[in-house]
Amino acid sequence: MTDFDKIFEGAIPEGKEPVALFREVYHGAITATSYAEILLNQAIRTYGPDHPVGYPDTAYYLPVIRCFSGEEVKKLGDLPPILNRKRAQVSPVLNFENARLAGEATWYAAEIIEALRYLKYKPDEPLLPPPWTGFIGDPVVRRFGIKMVDWTIPGEAIILGRAKDSKALAKIVKELMGMGFMLFICDEAVEQLLEENVKLGIDYIAYPLGNFTQIVHAANYALRAGMMFGGVTPGAREEQRDYQRRRIRAFVLYLGEHDMVKTAAAFGAIFTGFPVITDQPLPEDKQIPDWFFSVEDYDKIVQIAMETRGIKLTKIKLDLPINFGPAFEGESIRKGDMYVEMGGNRTPAFELVRTVSESEITDGKIEVIGPDIDQIPEGSKLPLGILVDIYGRKMQADFEGVLERRIHDFINYGEGLWHTGQRNINWLRVSKDAVAKGFRFKNYGEILVAKMKEEFPAIVDRVQVTIFTDEAKVKEYMEVAREKYKERDDRMRGLTDETVDTFYSCVLCQSFAPNHVCIVTPERVGLCGAVSWLDAKASYEINHAGPNQPIPKEGEIDPIKGIWKSVNDYLYTASNRNLEQVCLYTLMENPMTSCGCFEAIMAILPECNGIMITTRDHAGMTPSGMTFSTLAGMIGGGTQTPGFMGIGRTYIVSKKFISADGGIARIVWMPKSLKDFLHDEFVRRSVEEGLGEDFIDKIADETIGTTVDEILPYLEEKGHPALTMDPIM
């Protein structure tokens, strides 16, 4: 027995062994591994042992196998010895330990069966029609990494089988979505939810995986998080199980009639530390308290599952006519589904958070000035102003922009609400469905009052929201907003690394990557792109013991490379004594660590004397010879990798962007989508650096090539400055 397995000690009272359950698991594991063997032999006969095998968009081969035993499975011939070894661990001796090992073997069998399915995969011909996902690629795991790290996603719920009642299942799923859970759904439960018009798919963090063995894609998603963010070494089986138990707070809802293979797969979850709760009545010889047990009441099943897994939520429950939670943040509202639209250059619109005095505010007051949604016809376009007044004893003018940017998140949490942009270039839509359920403009105010207080309790004492839809009032307050924006921008222009005496740490991701430390400065956003210096400063005011700690800028060692003694001292302690020095302004010597939530990766291209940058959203090959996923697997987990580094996208247009290495003049390749995202600011910075307005056109992208040999002639033809700079190495 391993140290991890001690968590199972005492789970079964002496003399109460559920032998019938263990027998079911044994037969299920034998069936699963035998089926995998038959399919594998057929595949080898058809394709040959040297035929490639793997999933798309991952650097982790077959993740269950890579994680638990470390093998880099690349071809069909690699699989028979692995399957034979796992089949041999399925023992006819019926006890809890052997049942868990049989569960692990079932996960291996399911992974092999699914990998064989992907032998027929073509990028332009998905194996499953939307919204079914099948295997979920690394970019999606990383996309939601920061929400897992900061517990916006409080846990993972894996739902398999068929519910007694589709409406009751829809209620369970909506409850879980409202609380922010990541959902993995398999078998007939998917069809039941689609019948009830529950929104499923990657954008809703609710993955309809498919049927039967496709449940393994929940397992290979969770296991990649350990390797991706936690730096768990492939094959470190016990360390990975410990990580899953501590960091990935998952549970399984096993619904409907039991099947021996599904039950064996459920024991794979138990092997990894995830409890299994079923809605079926279970006799005493088929239960294990806290690990495999029955809750027949659908109104209690989620609460008991959360209690069993140790998940406690303290979020404010809003009384809204629509569902509300992070699951809906990625929802799009198409024109045909829209009831009303505001801003987006179609009508005047703005949003503003401003600090007011105690006498200027009535806490909780929400006022709508102008027509409400029920007073306008479907398809209308309205002007909109959102004015959020804040009073707080510790509130500072510098925090206004931090709170204002969260309006985007908070509104998007509403099902049927859509928000993009900020300040006076915001754009909002409300769906027909949300209006039919009773959504009105005052609900915007209720959301903002509650969330501002919940998220910023240390600096926000009172909140008042005014919603303007009267055009004259919108235009009047738009001028007030513009004056505020100008004041902020003037203040921010003076905020540089040189003008402050304090940097901030961000160790939020240490819940996933224990040795990773971000150093956030006025001119360097956190690598997730979500934490600026002002965000970190506000976070510290909210929670002095939180993830963002002030680091006095003391003991300057090298101002060119960006080395300070105080920063190094903090780094050494915060990285669990793993790192001794960080250079903030160079890629080439002791760069910042990378966890796994980064928006982009930069990598040295010595042949071009420069660097390339790729993003989480770009799945294609790069001139480094690696995709984003492969690069991310190489540098993630809290390690320093000179020549490679994860970054937030806006850092690229900072004056401190690898300034010791030559700055933006070193960039020789980046995806076209990144060029488009940064375009105006990048051109402005290029002019500031004396590189000219057309410098962005001298940088190659995927339309020019994806290898050094393809892009080098282009760089030479365009006279790219990196080619004549001092050697980068």
Swiss-Prot record:
Catalytic class of the enzyme: transferase
EC number(s) recorded for this UniProt protein: 2.3.1.169
Cofactor (UniProt): Ni cation; [4Fe-4S] cluster
Swiss-Prot/TrEMBL catalytic activity: Co(I)-[corrinoid Fe-S protein] + acetyl-CoA + H(+) = methyl-Co(III)-[corrinoid Fe-S protein] + CO + CoA
Residues binding Ni(2+) 2: 595-597
SUPFAM superfamilies, per the entry: Prismane protein-like
Record note on quaternary structure: Tetramer of two alpha and two beta chains.
Protein's job: The beta subunit generates CO from CO(2), while the alpha subunit (this protein) combines the CO with CoA and a methyl group to form acetyl-CoA. The methyl group, which is incorporated into acetyl-CoA, is transferred to the alpha subunit by a corrinoid iron-sulfur protein.
Name the record gives this protein: Carbon monoxide dehydrogenase/acetyl-CoA synthase subunit alpha
Species annotation: Moorella thermoacetica
Lineage per the UniProt record: Bacteria, Bacillati, Bacillota, Clostridia, Moorellales
